């Protein structure tokens, strides 16, 4: 029992060592484990089930929008990768190469896909001839490999799971609109499912995707004041279409190049959930994404009728929520701590006295508040409580983000804020890359995005003092 208790309680306080706190939760909540390959992880059932719920939401939305799922090869020939100059230069340092098949050296190196634009372009060039073939709306669920120097489970790994969408369109307007439609869907995923507020905006040219005309992003803020890029959507213009000779006959019979979009979310969203919502007791899962939304804990389960009533309750609730019954012989107190640590949104306690009174006790993971409900209406009450928990978690995350969002009007304010009050910094920018580079060099902060909702917090650039063009969210980031 002592060992069990230590397993539950031994989580490093986040204020003491945030990185170790994060690692403790990943391991103790059984989300992932380290593999024997540096930078690669084993996603355990608890972690993968969260990803499956993210998949379900995104896949359903994409199919509503008319997308189709496909599967592309894991390997890309070197000559294919070289076709788009900016793209290959952007990914070259992270590429893993296959040079041998068995004992035989390959005639041409094969890249293990870091992303699949080149493969989709090669395919689209073969199947598109006319404007009547457009748009092509493809998506794939797969893993990709990027040889990262510094890794951390879910946040930055050598191999990770994602969905990558690749679409081509007849016009620039249609493609740009589609890019923003997907970004908005990602925003809804974060807020409606993950209870995680985001800032929507456009990346600067320095931070945009290699080979893109425009990159749109959703940025979130973690407990420790660092930013995390939660999802991106790119408008690639005609750059890739021209590089790969994708052409179609337009409505006037003239040849033209389609406009390309690509976009993705990854398993780093699981890391974001941990760092936005978690506390010193462990993981705290938003109800709509939680693999198990409620756990039933029988109290004094050795007494007559308790387990039978708990089983009956499970059968009833299983029709409306994802529920688990823990009828193991561990003490109730240990179970409470374990499921708090694993982030189950709602605990349902039922014992002999509750059965006598035809009631159960609901305990929220987010604030530990207890509510007594009648067994006659428990299905409705549990569903209502899960919605209340989601809304409460979202509002709490918004409050934390807003409290850690600051304004700086000059470099002295910027440096003081980034060192002493980690978070988002709203500051004006002149548009000059040299200022962006200097801010990063001096403070370690990068431009996170130029928010769609622009405001003027100063007339001059925070760095050089010249006339400002855009409000930018800045921050140190994962």
Swiss-Prot record:
NCBIfam families (alphabetical): proS_fam_I (TIGR00408)
Record has Ligase as a keyword: yes
Family the UniProt entry places it in: Belongs to the class-II aminoacyl-tRNA synthetase family. ProS type 3 subfamily.
PANTHER family: BIFUNCTIONAL GLUTAMATE_PROLINE--TRNA LIGASE (PTHR43382:SF2), PROLYL-TRNA SYNTHETASE (PTHR43382)
Example GO molecular function: transferase activity
EC number of the protein: 6.1.1.15
Transmembrane segments: none
Name listed for the protein in its UniProt record: Proline--tRNA ligase
Protein keywords: Aminoacyl-tRNA synthetase, ATP-binding, Cytoplasm, Ligase, Nucleotide-binding, Protein biosynthesis
């Amino acid at each position: 029992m002592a060992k069990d208790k230590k397993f539950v309680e031994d989580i490093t306080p986040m204020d003491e060592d945030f990185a170790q706190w994060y690692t403790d939760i990943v391991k103790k909540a059984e989300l992932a484990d380290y593999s024997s390959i540096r930078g690669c992880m084993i996603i355990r059932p608890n972690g993968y089930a969260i990803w499956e719920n993210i998949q379900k939401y995104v896949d359903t939305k994409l199919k509503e929008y008319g997308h189709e799922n496909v599967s592309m090869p894991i390997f890309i020939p070197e000559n294919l990768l070289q076709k788009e100059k900016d793209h290959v230069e952007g990914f070259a340092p992270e590429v893993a190469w296959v040079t041998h098949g068995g004992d035989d050296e390959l005639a041409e190196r094969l890249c293990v896909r870091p992303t699949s634009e080149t493969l989709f372009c090669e395919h689209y060039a073969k199947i598109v001839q006319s404007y009547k073939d457009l748009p092509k709306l493809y998506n794939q669920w797969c893993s990709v490999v990027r040889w990262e120097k510094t890794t951390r489970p879910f946040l930055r790994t050598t191999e990770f799971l994602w969905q990558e969408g690749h679409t081509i369109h007849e016009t620039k307007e249609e493609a740009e609109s589609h890019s923003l439609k997907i970004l908005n869907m990602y925003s809804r995923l974060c807020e409606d499912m993950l209870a995680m507020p985001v800032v929507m905006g456009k990346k600067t040219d320095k931070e945009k995707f290699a080979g893109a005309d425009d990159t749109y992003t959703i940025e979130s803020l973690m407990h420790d004041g660092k930013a995390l890029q939660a999802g991106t959507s790119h408008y690639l213009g005609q750059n890739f279409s021209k590089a790969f000779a994708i052409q179609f006959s337009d409505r006037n019979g003239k040849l033209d190049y389609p406009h390309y979009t690509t976009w993705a979310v990854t398993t780093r969203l699981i890391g974001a959930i941990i760092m936005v919502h978690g506390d010193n007791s462990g993981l705290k899962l938003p109800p709509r994404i939680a693999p198990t939304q409620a756990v039933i804990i029988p109290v004094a389960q050795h007494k007559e009728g308790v387990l039978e009533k708990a089983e009956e309750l499970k059968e009833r609730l299983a029709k409306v929520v994802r529920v688990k019954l823990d009828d193991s012989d561990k003490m109730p107190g240990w179970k409470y701590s374990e499921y708090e640590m694993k982030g189950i949104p709602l605990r349902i306690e039922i014992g002999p006295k509750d059965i006598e009174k035809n009631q159960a006790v609901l305990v929220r993971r987010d604030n530990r508040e207890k509510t007594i409900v009648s067994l006659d209406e428990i299905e409705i009450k549990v569903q209502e409580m899960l919605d209340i928990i989601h809304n409460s978690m979202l509002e709490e995350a918004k409050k934390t983000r807003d409290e850690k969002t600051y304004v700086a009007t000059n470099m002295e304010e910027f440096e003081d804020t980034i060192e002493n009050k980690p978070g988002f910094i709203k500051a004006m920018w002149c548009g000059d890359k040299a200022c962006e580079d200097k801010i990063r060099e001096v403070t370690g902060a990068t431009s996170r995005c130029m928010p769609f909702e622009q405001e003027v917090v100063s007339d001059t650039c925070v760095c050089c003092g010249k006339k400002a063009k855009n409000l930018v969210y800045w921050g140190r980031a994962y």
